[in-house]
Design a protein with these regions (language model features):
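Residues forming the flavin
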Residues: 1-95, 99-254
């Protein structure tokens, strides 16, 4: 029997999850091993509850670390600026539906999953990966990438394991600073991502309703008859002189 190739994925956030799904479904000759420093989403929820209610912080299982990544405990808005009707985006939405999201998100202009659904969706995705033979190592931290002849050939973990691999995918998010430092020290080419700074703006909902709908229809919203939803908006501007842009993000009307 031919030995399967091994691919190690570091991180089980959105990038790691969809990378694993793609490999497991399309490359049956590949053994997928996922290393996640945090906990499964169920235990992660317990750790977050302990933080909120008892001020007890787990440094490896919290709002930033764990299955699903940093966005798991957000409100589940599905936003994209790369083409809502592109085939890749459609495939992502269909995958969410496959694992428990409401089918309506395939037609909605502003699809929204909700935090409560994310736990079920992630759990179902994990079960699916395991059924296809993927190995998921929770509570395990990748400490170093083994590089030979300018090629990643495996990883070492905090618990002392060495995992040989034909390829390594780093889907760590932005907070794995020790790993980034190790890669830099080993001469791996790193490229800075552009930096964005954000701040919160609040407007009275009544003001937005009037600005967007005008006086007549704004009153329909205020009467609460349900025929017209509360108004929202999106603004964007690019300074052509230095090609810097500003845009609104994560609008929460109501």
């Amino acid at each position: 029997k031919k030995k399967k190739k091994t691919v190690v994925i570091v991180g089980l956030g959105p990038a790691g999850l969809f990378c694993a799904l793609t490999l497991a479904r399309n490359y049956t000759d590949t053994k997928v091993i996922i290393i996640e420093r945090g906990e499964p989403v169920e235990r992660r929820g317990q750790a977050i509850g302990a933080l909120f209610h008892r001020r007890k912080l787990s440094e490896t299982s919290n709002l930033c670390y764990g299955e699903g990544g940093a966005g798991t405990w957000s409100d589940g808005k599905l936003t994209t600026r790369i083409g809502r009707n592109g085939e890749q985006v459609k495939d992502v939405f269909k995958t969410f539906v496959e694992f428990g999201a409401p089918p309506e998100i395939l037609q909605m202009g502003k699809p929204h999953l909700g935090t409560d659904r994310m736990v079920k969706i992630l759990r179902n995705a994990r079960y699916h990966l395991e059924e296809m033979g993927c190995e998921i190592m929770f509570d395990e931290t990748c400490r170093a990438v083994i590089v030979e002849d300018n090629k990643a050939v495996g990883v070492t973990t905090e618990s002392g394991k060495t995992i040989d691999a034909e390829a390594v995918v780093l889907a760590t998010g932005h907070s794995s600073r020790a790993l980034f430092e190790q890669l830099s020290n080993d001469g791996v080419l790193l490229e800075f991502q552009s930096f964005a700074s954000g701040f919160r703006i609040e407007h009275p909902q009544e003001l937005l309703n009037e600005l967007q709908y005008g006086d007549r229809f704004a009153k329909e919203v205020e009467r609460g008859k349900g025929r017209i939803p509360v108004a929202d908006y999106r603004v964007a501007h690019t300074n052509k002189a230095d090609n810097r842009g500003v845009f609104s993000f994560c609008m929460c009307p109501g």
